[in-house]
Amino acid sequence: MTPRLSIIIPVRNDAASLNRTLDYLVGLVGISETEIIVAASGDEEGTKRAVAERARLLWPADSTRAALLNAGAAVAHGQVLFFLHADSFPPANAFELIYHSTSDERVVGGAFEHLFVERQWTLRVITWLNRIRYQFTRNYYGDQGLFVRTSVFHQMRGYKDLQLMEDLDFSQRLKRVGKSILIRTPLLTSGRRFLAHGPWRTLFFVLWLLLLHTLRLDTERYSKRWRGSASRPPGSPWAQGHLHEEAEPPI
């Protein structure tokens, strides 16, 4: 049976988060009508254990997030592509919400409301600021769970091969193709990068990258600082220091 939805998860050295997300996904209503594709780089043994035959596993030659996302989309069979970070948890009725949204022929894709798993007040403020940004601009980040009609994705030729801001660039191009909507139900995502690096320091770094991207200036030179070493998992501190304890995922 052809799946209605293809869930594509890019992952790099993040088997523990991937395992929790897959545990959560397989319990959602409607999962039988979907396919899950994991496009991975880095920790091969840990990633294979995490997947445990619950998803199709790919190992693309290129390890940038854009390359992983495009590789997953290239083998997907669903009518709609749903790009999900390895540390994110869509709402329990996410698939139904996506199907309902795309039943409108004018809608080409969209994203979910953003909310951090962790409850720190600083992250709540950052969430509030971020919501003002994307509700005004309709430019969404990947940690909001971007979704798009498969035909539209191929029409757009997928994600551009960027080291940074590939999700924002895609979202900006998507709304030029057709109606890109915001599903008001929150998708939960880990704030570990903000906690590891310092919430305000990370926020201002993101704003700096956003400014450079908006002005069409180079952001590539900051990619290693943002992504971190290829041998380390996401959310590792930029420098030595205390890594805040993560909240338990909502499963």
Model-derived segments and their meaning:
Residues P3-S6, E35, D169:
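Cell-envelope/extracellular polymer assembly enzymes that use nucleotide-activated donors
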Residues N13-G27:
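Short, well-formed alpha-helical segments that are part of the catalytic scaffolds
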Residues A16-R20, D43-E53, N93:
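Acidic helix N-cap motif at the loop->helix transition within catalytic regions
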Residues Y24, A39-K48, S88-F89:
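A conserved acidic beta->alpha catalytic loop
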Residues P60-A76:
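Glycine-rich, basic loop-to-helix element that forms the pyrophosphate-binding segment
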Residues L81:
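Short aromatic/hydrophobic "clamp" motif used to bind/position activated sugar donors
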Residues A92-T122:
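Conserved donor NDP-sugar-binding/catalytic core segment of glycosyltransferases
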Residues Q172-I251:
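Hydrophobic helical membrane-anchoring modules
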